A protein has these predicted regions:
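NAD(P)+-binding Rossmann beta1-loop-alpha1 motif at the extreme N-terminus of oxidoreductases
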Residues: 1-56
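NAD(P)-dependent Rossmann-like dehydrogenase/reductase catalytic/cofactor-binding core
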Residues: 2-7, 29, 166, 176-187, ...
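Rossmann-like dinucleotide-binding cores of NAD(P)H-dependent redox enzymes
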Residues: 35-69, 159-167, 182, 189-197
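Rossmann-like NAD(P)-binding element
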Residues: 42, 56-117, 125
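Rossmann-fold dinucleotide-binding core
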Residues: 117-187, 191-195
Length: 294
């Protein structure tokens, strides 16, 4: 990328639910996409889920067979960070830990070309802090996709203190090029969505914990009564109960809002290994590991 145009995209953490969804968005929109994760087995499993998603899209007449084939051809995988060296944009969707994300960006700075933009898919952490010490703070931007990324159009775009206007404008234009709908938000915990959703989801968990209603009835009330496509407990299962705890741990110390504190039921379920879709059991049970939607 010498003219501000993004042509090749890397996704770090591409074997995860969010990362694989982001890779679908990129490849489907016509961009060469390099998927990085730490193990080949995880990448192979993600590839199978991705191809299954494309197959469903064809079956539902949302994609032609030719478009499916082209999208699959645009996807490649690597377990080496230097496989992302010539990408114009690298989107990280790794574990929601400041230390992990900072270390990744430092390593990417060592291997990627000078023009590469780094985008963080963090949902809670400060973009300014993530970028700190990476060596190209002016070329780091927040780019928060919503789960499932391949179906949800919204992206929350957040500049850090050092993010250049050119970086933000280029990243903003790219989100539109892949068919997403960006909104700009300040670099604050939770940005827009999670600042509202984390307490709301916790309230739903507490309602189940207090015996107000079953998880299914809480979700049904929200979907039918408020017109939501997904109930809060279905959403927590999709995001991961462990991730919901991480969100709480990021929010509560900053806001001191009691609604942002992790409910005891949530902690007990995570301790029992009930993490939602990823483990096969959360507020609901699941009988397979398939890509959401199609």
């Amino acid at each position: 990328m010498t003219d501000g145009t993004i042509r090749k995209v890397g996704v770090a953490g591409a074997a995860g639910t969010m990362g694989s969804g982001i890779a679908i968005v990129c490849a489907r929109a016509g961009f060469e996409t390099v998927c990085y994760d730490v193990t080949a087995d995880a990448l192979d499993a993600a590839k199978a889920r991705t191809q299954g998603f494309f197959d469903k899209s064809v079956a539902r007449n949302k994609m032609t067979k030719e478009a499916r084939g082209a999208a699959v051809q645009r996807l490649s995988s690597t377990t080496q960070l230097d496989g992302l060296a010539d990408c114009d944009l690298v989107i990280e969707a790794v574990f929601e830990s400041l230390d992990v994300k900072q270390a990744l960006l430092r390593h990417l700075n060592d291997v990627c070309k000078d023009a590469t933009i780094f985008a963080s898919n963090t949902s809670t952490l400060s973009i300014t802090e993530i970028a700190g010490g990476c060596g190209r703070e002016d070329r780091v931007v927040g780019m928060h996709f919503c789960l499932p990324a391949q179906l949800m159009k919204l992206i929350e775009m957040s500049p850090g203190v050092s993010t250049s206007d050119a970086t933000f404008d280029t990243a903003w234009a790219w989100t539109k090029a892949v068919g997403q709908l960006p909104v700009q938000t300040q670099d604050k915990p939770g940005f827009i969505l999670n600042a509202l959703l984390v307490p709301f989801n916790n309230d739903a968990i507490r309602a189940v914990e207090a015996g107000v209603a079953s998880a299914a009835d809480v979700d049904k009330a929200i979907k039918v009564g408020l017109g939501y496509k997904m109930g809060p407990l279905e959403l927590v299962d999709l995001v991961g109960l462990d991730t919901q705890i991480l969100l709480c741990e990021a929010f509560y110390p900053v806001t001191l809002d009691p609604r942002a504190a992790a409910p005891p039921l949530l902690k007990r379920m995570v301790a029992a290994g009930h993490l939602g879709r990823k483990s096969g059991r959360g507020f609901y049970t699941y009988d397979g590991s398939t890509m959401f939607g199609g």
